[in-house]
Amino acid sequence: MARVKRAVNARKHHRKILKLAKGYYGGKSKLFKTANESVIRALRNAYVGRKLKKRDFRKLWIVRINAAARINGLSYSKFMNGIKTAGININRKMLSEIAINDPKTFTELVQVAKAQLNV
């Protein structure tokens, strides 16, 4: 059986990792082992960040809707309940956009929710 020399594959792998580590400080962009550790950590953090982003935006939308609803005299949970029972299907992202960009329309939505809840 022939001997396998890994020089080409190893060099290719090292080049790939060092390219990903471009712009890192000091040895983290020059030395393979530290660069590899940094790249692995960076990729893991990027993966986790993509998951957290969804949670963070949902929280932001809820905070915005709650603030706008309270200005109109209704809490977030009561507002959402009133909207759901009225049969209005608007997601939180759109509600938060309406609350910021078109307060008049949002006030009308709050009135619909209040009428549905008999408040």
UniProtKB/Swiss-Prot annotation:
Q: State a single Gene Ontology molecular function.
A: structural constituent of ribosome
Q: Which UniProt keywords apply?
A: Ribonucleoprotein, Ribosomal protein, RNA-binding, rRNA-binding
An example Gene Ontology CC term for this record: ribonucleoprotein complex
List, alphabetically, the Pfam families matched. Ribosomal_L20
Superkingdom of this entry's organism?
A: Bacteria
The residues forming a coiled coil are: none
- Could you mention a single GO BP entry for this protein? ribosomal large subunit assembly
In terms of CDD domains, this protein maps to: Ribosomal_L20
| Free-text function comment from the UniProt entry | Binds directly to 23S ribosomal RNA and is necessary for the in vitro assembly process of the 50S ribosomal subunit. It is not involved in the protein synthesizing functions of that subunit.
Family (UniProt):
Belongs to the bacterial ribosomal protein bL20 family.
| Protein name per UniProt | Large ribosomal subunit protein bL20
